[in-house]
Amino acid sequence: MKNNKPLILAIDTSCDDTSASVMNGQIILSNVIASQTQLHKQYGGVFPTVAKQAHKENIAPTINAAIKKAKISWENIDALAVTIGPGLAPALEVGINAITELAKEKNIPLIAVNHIEGHALSAIAKRNSKEIEKDSISYPVLSVVVSGGHTQFIYFEEIGKYKILGTTIDDAAGECLDKIGRMLNLGYPAGPTIEKFAKLGDEKKFKFPLPMTSIKSFDMSFSGLKTFARNYIQSLTEDKPLSKQDIYDFCASAQYSVFRHINYKLNKLIIDKPINEIWLGGGVAQNIYLRQTIRETIKNFEKNNPTKKITFRYPHTNRLCMDNAAMIGLVANFKFERSEFITDFESLERKPRWKIGTNH
């Protein structure tokens, strides 16, 4: 049943997943994802031209499936939304072309969305109206986005006005873990395998450094951990290959070091800034151990500051951590309320390096 919020059809083709969703305000009516993971396995990573062709093949059936699953018709749709960046330029182009054609054909308003804003808000997507009734946001909010392409601390006192307080200056956390996994021949993508193996290992077995402790900023760096891992693996395998237990221990130690770095900076942030809620988003937000470590950081802060309480949220389903269109429709809902529509379709361009909170 439609509430008084807009019905928005959103699509996301930012990387290697084609997704379409129908959102009724913050409520997910459908969230269809056509994954390309199997296609890119042979390359050990996302191959842009392959991704573009797969998006072209998947976009129309994915949109149709989202509308069908939501049990609505085109006449019900109040607005269209699309990711225009950041992401792979050839992939973004497919989504932009598809949605602008639909906007012209159906004469429906169009909203452009930043992919990272989607991850930043994904924790407040809802299953039904009861969840909204029971919920209220207490600002300021710090969104922690951890993915294969981005690792950022995003601060805001209202949705739509963001400030990046910290970001990785090189590799993202997810990329670092994937590359360490590749060094251990764990396949692609390696992140989920590292999490699985880490449960069987000793996280203190191999001592990784803690980066950027002498830097006052909240920025992060993961390239040093990746280099350290490569050199460590080379030294360990000089005489004999790694045993299964060695691999488990190395996965546990690598994962621990990456999340320790994030939490070290997060702890500095919550001491320094007024923060009432922390929202976790991005592909690595699926990692249960990451959620546990953030909970622990919050718990320790509250123990030392008894009058302060921080609410911790993360997406209610792992599908919202992946690249998906529901989070794009969620952002579009708030932009709809602010009347932030695209008036000139011809001027709509992909923005592969678009930073949240900026126009470029």
Region locations from a protein language model:
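Conserved phosphate-binding/catalytic loops in two-lobed NTP-binding clefts
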Residues: 112-113, 295-328, 342
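N-terminal beta-alpha supersecondary unit
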Residues: 5-76, 82-86, 115
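Conserved phosphate-binding catalytic cores of ATP/NTP-utilizing and phosphoryl-transfer enzymes
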Residues: 1-4, 113-141, 331
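A short helix-loop
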Residues: 2-8, 13-14, 21, 31, ...
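Glycine-rich phosphate-binding/hydrolytic loop that grips phosphoryl groups
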Residues: 119-122, 315-359
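Glycine-rich phosphate-binding loops at beta-strand->alpha-helix junctions
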Residues: 92, 275-297, 317
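Phosphate/pyrophosphate-binding loops at sites that engage ATP/ADP/AMP, CoA/4′-phosphopantetheine
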Residues: 62-78, 131, 237-240, 265-276
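Glycine-rich beta-strand-to-loop/alpha-helix junction loops that act as flexible
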Residues: 82-86, 102, 147, 278-287
